[in-house]
């Protein structure tokens, strides 16, 4: 279990998780606001 925690706390794994989360967030925003290029334009 300690090895798994050490592996998950390394920088490349954290970077991949962060990028994947941001990509999923952008995809979901694009699904609900398909015509909005920017977030500020979707609420005006």
UniProtKB/Swiss-Prot annotation:
Per UniProt, the keywords (alphabetical) are: Chloroplast, Membrane, Photosynthesis, Photosystem I, Plastid, Thylakoid, Transmembrane, Transmembrane helix
Give membrane topology per the record. Answer: Single-pass membrane protein
| GO BP term, pick one | photosynthesis
Q: Name one GO cellular component term.
A: chloroplast thylakoid membrane
Predominantly, its location class is plastid
Localization recorded for this chain is: Plastid, Chloroplast thylakoid membrane
Please tell me whether the keyword Chloroplast is annotated for this protein.
yes
Q: What are the transmembrane regions?
A: 7-27
Q: Which InterPro entries match?
A: PSI_PsaJ (IPR002615), PSI_PsaJ_sf (IPR036062)
Write down the superkingdom of origin.
Answer: Eukaryota
Family statement drawn from the similarity comment of this UniProt entry? Belongs to the PsaJ family.
What is this protein for, i.e. what is its function?
Answer: May help in the organization of the PsaE and PsaF subunits.
Spell out the protein name for this chain: Photosystem I reaction center subunit IX
């Amino acid at each position: 279990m300690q090895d798994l925690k050490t592996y998950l706390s390394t920088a490349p794994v954290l970077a991949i998780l962060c990028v994947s989360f941001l990509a999923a967030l952008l995809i979901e925003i694009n699904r609900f606001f398909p015509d909005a290029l920017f977030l500020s334009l979707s609420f005006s």
